Amino acid sequence: NSESQWASVKRALRVFDGVIPTVFATGNHDYGVRNAEDRTTQFNDHFPLTHNPLTCDGQGGGIFLEGPATRDGKVTLENAAYVVKVPGGRNLLIVSLEWGPRRFAVEWAREIFARPRFRDHLGILLIHDYLLPSNQRDGQDGNRKRPGNPHWYKTGLAGDTHDGEDLWNALVRKTPNLRLVLNGHEMGAHVGYRQDDNDAGKAVHQ
């Protein structure tokens, strides 16, 4: 979470500006000094709402729909919803959530997915921590003290955070149109996959 690293990432991603829209899901190393010591971040300084006009041009254009206001009244891309219209196909509702999302973010996401206008959209959730290489959701075994689990970091010590199993129970399984969850956090070739039916009996690919 250093100025030089953020500047480097911004330069690298600038190639997409005005060419294709970009969507982010912030991770533990985007917060605090090095590794989620707190919720401070330089993400919003380098990637404001209007960083890419195809994501949000500030005048209603772009795929950005909305995000919940923070305590200081700002809307950022840390928690954001996007609508992607697919010609001849099923439109997408993409929601990206902050690292170890707090309750307000999860509740906001649940409300977005539940809106009648998005009933027939294909819902996609982007989140940094969710599935492990073992194909288990993080926290599914009840171990919230595992290094790497959001509850293990200082940002999660107060209890207002969600790991993969928390998200499954609080959001994913309860949302009929949420059919795909994508996450990062696991390094190298550590890729997991699982499919579970949600409470509506529909398959969710994770």
Model-identified regions with their sequence ranges:
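Extended active-site neighborhood of metal-dependent phosphoesterases/phosphodiesterases
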Residues: S2-W108, R117-F118, V191-Q206
